Amino acid sequence: MNKYKEIFGVDISKDVFDVHGSKSGHDQFKNNALGFKSFLKSLPKESLVVMEATGYYHYRLAQFLFKQGVLVSVVNPLSVKRFIQMKLAKVKTDKSDAKAICEYGKINEVPLYTALTDVQSECLQLFRLMDSCLKKRTATKNKIHGEDVLGIPSKYVYRSLKRIKKYLDKEILGIEKKLLSLVKQEQQVQLTLLTSIPGIGIKTALFLIVITDGFDKFENAKQLCSYAGITPTIRESGSSVRGRSRISKVGNRKLRNLLFLCSFTACKHNKGCREVYERIVNKGKSKKLALIAVSNKLIKQSFAIAKSGNPYDEKYVSVLPK
C-alpha cells in the first residue's frame, strides 16, 4: 500500500504545466503564481508531487510547493524516459507525460526534494539572466557582421550596435562577478578544487557547484552523467559496425553544452582526457564520440575531486564507484 494519499505527476512547459493525479486524473494550470496557487488548493493532504528536472522550469514550482509544506520529488528525466520506453508507449503528449511521471512515482521509491538555499536560488536566476544576455550579444555580433558585409554600413546603425554590444559585455561581466562572489560565500573550497582540473573553466565550475549543491545531490558520477545527458548513444544496423554517436537530448542542456565545450581544451591539456580521446579516435570512432567520452571523463574527475577534497593530480587513480 502506498504511503501517500495521492501521487501527482507534473509535466512542466514554458507557459503551462500538466498534472495527472493517481485518483483525480488530468488537469492543467498556468505556469505562473496564480497557477501555482490553484494547483496548491487542489492538492489533498499527504500528497506527493513528482516532476522531472527540466532545467529552469521546474525550480519555481518545486520551491513554491516545498515552502507550502507539500512533499515534492524531482526525478531524472532520463529515468522517466526509460520507464516510458519500457511501457512501449506510442503516444507522447504533455498529458501522457504527466501520467507517466505519476506512474513512475507510484512504482519507484523517489527521493524527496529539499529546497534551494537563497544563494542557490539567486545563482540560478543569475545563470538564466546570463544566458539571455549571451544570446542577445551573439545576435548583436551577427548584426554587426551583417552590416560589415553590406559594404556601406550606416554609421548610426553601426555605432548603435557597438554600444549595445559594449553594454551587454559589461552586464555579462557583472553577472559573472556576482556569481563568483555568491558561490565563494559557501563553496570556495569546491570552486578551487574544480578549477584545478585542466579543461574545467570558472563558468563550468560555478554551474556544477550550483546545480549539484556542492555535489551533495548525487551519490555517484554515473548519476551526474545521466543528469547531464552525456552518456553516448551509438546506433548500429545490419552489418554496419560504426553507428552514429549522439549526445542524449535528455538531461540538463546547459551543463551538457558547457562540458562539451570544455572537452576541446581538456583533450589538449588534461592527461586523462587526452588518453580517452586518443584511444577512441585510434579505434576508428568519430571525434564527436570521443569528445562525449571526454565530457563524461570530466564529470568523473570533478566528482572524484569534489568528494576526495584533493586537487587535480594527473597521476591520481580514482577509487570511487563509476
Where are the model-predicted features located?
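A residue-level signal for conserved active-site and pocket-lining positions in enzyme catalytic cores
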Residues: 101, 133, 259, 284, ...
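Short, solvent-exposed helix-loop connector elements
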Residues: 112-125, 153, 243-246, 275-292
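Low-complexity, acidic/Ser/Thr- and charged residue-rich accessory regions of DNA metabolism proteins
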Residues: 239-240, 277-322
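Phosphate- and other anionic-substrate recognition elements at nucleic-acid/protein interfaces
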Residues: 1-155, 268
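Phosphate-backbone recognition surface of nucleic-acid-processing proteins
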Residues: 29, 38, 193, 208-283, ...
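Short helix-capping/linker segments at secondary-structure and domain boundaries
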Residues: 108-112, 213-217, 265-272, 299-314
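Helix-hairpin-helix/helix-loop-helix acidic hairpins
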Residues: 148-203, 212, 270
